[in-house]
């Protein structure tokens, strides 16, 4: 039985760090107000010359190097983003060029904050279906470029960055002790699309638009949706919350993370938190948190890791992976 095993991981962040106090001269807010409601203390903001493609390519190079591979070993470059460099061609193709890859194929996937979870699921299907042996899965965003910097309810929440993993086909035994992707579950419900969206686009306003969000509505639905899809993953594998070594959630809001972990009965010390230093980086959120926990030695080979995310649409999903 073929499994999709994580071979390497990498990340990249813009140079500029914007602290909560930096917003005090832009909108009516304070460090205390932001921390109390979100857990965010700072975030990275892309500067001149830093784009979704440049950040994604940097994270990709780091992941390929960490895997001990060459760019030419990659069969598929799969980029999760909702802030591409251009409407077309796909930013994944631009990253493919930046890496010097002239074989295989590349495309973008857009599921907003759930994008990396959707991308891992897609990559796993390509690998298990025999269409690719090694897939570079990237989550990269520059949300700072679609924010309304006069809206204090949204501009303080988001940051920019990128994370990437290399998934590789490996023989498994069909057991939950196997390394690799053990289960994936995806969901969406378009009835909620007006609760979190961008008010522009090439086919409607011919503009980029700005992010709009009904924060209370998102919070109201988030915990239930997240825990339901995770419980479905447990049911599919026979695993339980007690088996989880590390819970790596989408880093949108610490209150949502805490409430989800509590409902799932996952101990606080098993939850990876980076929202305080990254803010909400959308599709880059989960791989950035993963890369942080791998780099500091928390996540080790053989650990059972639970990933989840929820984003605009609504879209949401979960992945269980044996590291």
Curated annotation (Swiss-Prot):
Organism domain of life: Bacteria
Involved pathway(s): Lipid metabolism; fatty acid biosynthesis
Catalytic activity from the UniProt record: malonyl-[ACP] + acetyl-CoA + H(+) = 3-oxobutanoyl-[ACP] + CO2 + CoA
Keyword Cytoplasm included in the entry's annotation: yes
Cellular component annotations (GO), alphabetically ordered: cytoplasm
CDD domains reported in the protein's UniProt record: KAS_III
Gene3D superfamilies referenced in this protein's UniProt entry, alphabetically: 3.40.47.10
Keywords: Acyltransferase, Cytoplasm, Fatty acid biosynthesis, Fatty acid metabolism, Lipid biosynthesis, Lipid metabolism, Multifunctional enzyme, Transferase
Residue numbers annotated as active site: 113, 250, 280
Pfam families reported in the protein's UniProt record: ACP_syn_III, ACP_syn_III_C
Principal location class: cytoplasm
Enzyme Commission (EC) number: 2.3.1.180
Any GO MF annotation of the entry: beta-ketoacyl-acyl-carrier-protein synthase III activity
The keyword Lipid metabolism appears for this protein: yes
InterPro entries, alphabetized: ACP_syn_III_C, ACP_syn_III_N, FabH, Thiolase-like
Compartment(s) where it occurs, according to its Swiss-Prot or TrEMBL record: Cytoplasm
Biological process, per Gene Ontology: fatty acid biosynthetic process
Leader sequence segment: none
Region (ACP-binding): 251-255
Domain notes: The last Arg residue of the ACP-binding site is essential for the weak association between ACP/AcpP and FabH.
Quaternary structure (record): Homodimer.
HAMAP family to which the protein is assigned, alphabetical: FabH
Family: Belongs to the thiolase-like superfamily. FabH family.
Function as written in the Swiss-Prot or TrEMBL entry: Catalyzes the condensation reaction of fatty acid synthesis by the addition to an acyl acceptor of two carbons from malonyl-ACP. Catalyzes the first condensation reaction which initiates fatty acid synthesis and may therefore play a role in governing the total rate of fatty acid production. Possesses both acetoacetyl-ACP synthase and acetyl transacylase activities. Its substrate specificity determines the biosynthesis of branched-chain and/or straight-chain of fatty acids.
UniProt-recorded name of the protein: Beta-ketoacyl-[acyl-carrier-protein] synthase III
């Amino acid at each position: 039985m073929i499994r999709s095993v994580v071979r390497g991981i990498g990340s990249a962040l813009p140079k500029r760090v914007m602290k909560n106090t930096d917003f005090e001269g832009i909108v009516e807010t304070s460090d205390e107000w932001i921390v109390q409601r979100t857990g965010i203390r700072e975030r990275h903001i892309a500067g001149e010359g830093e784009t979704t493609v440049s950040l994604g390519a940097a994270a990709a190079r780091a992941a390929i190097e960490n895997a001990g591979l060459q760019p030419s070993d990659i069969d598929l470059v799969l980029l999760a983003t909702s802030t591409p460099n251009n409407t077309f061609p796909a930013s994944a193709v631009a990253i493919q060029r930046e890496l010097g890859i002239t074989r295989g194929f590349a495309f973008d996937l857009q599921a907003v904050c759930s994008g990396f979870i959707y991308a891992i699921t897609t990559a796993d299907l390509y690998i298990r279906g025999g269409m690719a042996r090694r897939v570079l899965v990237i989550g990269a965003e520059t949300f700072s470029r679609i924010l309304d910097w006069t809206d204090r309810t949204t501009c303080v929440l988001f940051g920019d960055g990128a994370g990437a993993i290399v998934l590789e086909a490996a023989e498994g035994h069909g057991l939950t002790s196997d390394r690799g992707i053990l289960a994936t579950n995806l969901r969406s419900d378009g009835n909620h699309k007006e609760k979190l969206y961008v008010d522009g686009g090439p086919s409607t306003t011919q503009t980029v638009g700005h992010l709009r969000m009904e924060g209370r509505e998102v919070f109201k639905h988030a915990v239930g949706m997240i825990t339901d899809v995770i419980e479905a993953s447990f049911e599919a594998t026979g695993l339980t919350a007690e088996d989880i070594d590390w819970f790596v959630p989408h880093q949108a809001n610490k209150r949502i993370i805490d409430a989800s972990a509590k409902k799932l009965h996952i101990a606080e010390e098993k939850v990876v938190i980076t929202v305080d230093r990254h803010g909400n980086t959308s599709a880059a959120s989960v791989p950035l948190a993963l890369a942080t926990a791998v780099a500091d030695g928390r996540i080790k080979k053989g650990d059972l890791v639970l990933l989840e995310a929820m984003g605009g649409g609504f879209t949401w999903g979960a992945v269980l992976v044996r590291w």
